[in-house]
Each structure stands twice: as C-alpha cells, then as structure tokens.
Amino acid sequence: MEKLADLNYTLGVITLLNDTLHNILEEPGMVYFPYIVSALTVLFTMHKASLPAMKLAMRTFQCSYRIIKRVVVTLINTLLRLGGYNDYLTDKDETEKQINRVVKELRQQLTMIEKLTTREIEQVELLKRIYDMMIVRHDSEIDMSKETNQKAFKTLHDWKNDRSYDDNTEVIAPL
C-alpha cells in the first residue's frame, strides 16, 4: 500500500508502461495498435453503458423493442462516426418524422407562392389600369359620357365681360 502512495513508484510504473508502448509501436506490424486500442476502449465503454439499459428494457415489455432498436442504432452510428463516415442509420420513426417535416415545409412554401402569385397578378392588373389611364388619346376616342355638362358653365371670355361674383352687392332682406 505504501508503494501505491509513493510518487516515485507511480512515476516509475508510468515510465515503464510508456517505454513498453514505444517498444511495441516501433515494430512495423504494430502501427495500428493505437487505433485498435481506442476502438476496443470505445466498445468496452459502450458495452458497460448499454448492459444496464438492455436489462431495464427487458424488464419493461412495452418499450423493450424500441429501446433495443434505439441502442443498436446508436451503437452503429457511433462506430460509423469513429470510422470517419458521415453517413448514419435512422430508424423508421425518425424517417417518418423527417418526411412529415419536409412535407409541412413544402406546404408552407406552396401557400406562400400562391399568395405571392395572387399579389403579383393583382399588381400587374393595377399597373395595366394605371397605364391605360395615362395613355394620351385623341379627342374622338375620349368618352365624354362621364364628363359634366360644360355648356351650363361660363367660359373665361364670359367672365371677363360680365360682372364678377366676388363684387359686393347689397342684400336686402325683408323684415
């Protein structure tokens, strides 16, 4: 017990392990040793972490299949990521969720496109009406049916020769 607490002894053990690993790695056949060790470490950790989850899943019959499937998919995805692959596995529920999300987004985009198209059509019609109103037409083409009757009003020449309505006139009211 005293040897375990001794710092020099601990450093000696660590030095011995490092020297052993360096001697092993110098051999040409052991180039892949660190990769193998890291993969085995991950597998051991996943094994230790997944066993309690599997035991719990087996006790509950209702969700055991889903939990086991989820654990297996997670394990495979972890191994794929450790291997450097960007692909991953999905279960059926996850795929259906993604499909539903994509369909929902497509419906929203279609309604937005429909609204925008309706607005654009209305704007084009409004621009056409404005353009039609701005076009210079000949006198024969102008529809005078909506114009007021100009004959009842005095012209500018009549105003010059006649008395102005602005002149003060005396108004006598009967008492």
UniProtKB/Swiss-Prot annotation:
Domain topic, free-text comment: Binds 1 calcium ion per tetramer.
Cytoplasmic side: 52-175
Pfam families: Rota_NSP4
Official protein name in the record: Non-structural glycoprotein 4
Keyword Ion transport: yes
Residues that bind Ca(2+): 120, 123
Membrane topology: Single-pass type III membrane protein
Entry PTM: The N-glycosyl content is primarily Man(9)GlcNAc, with a small amount of Man(8)GlcNAc.
Transmembrane segments: 29-51
Residues in compartment: Lumenal: 1-28
Species this chain originates from: Rotavirus A (isolate RVA/Mouse/United States/Eb/1982/G16P10[16])
Classification lineage: Viruses, Riboviria, Orthornavirae, Duplornaviricota, Resentoviricetes
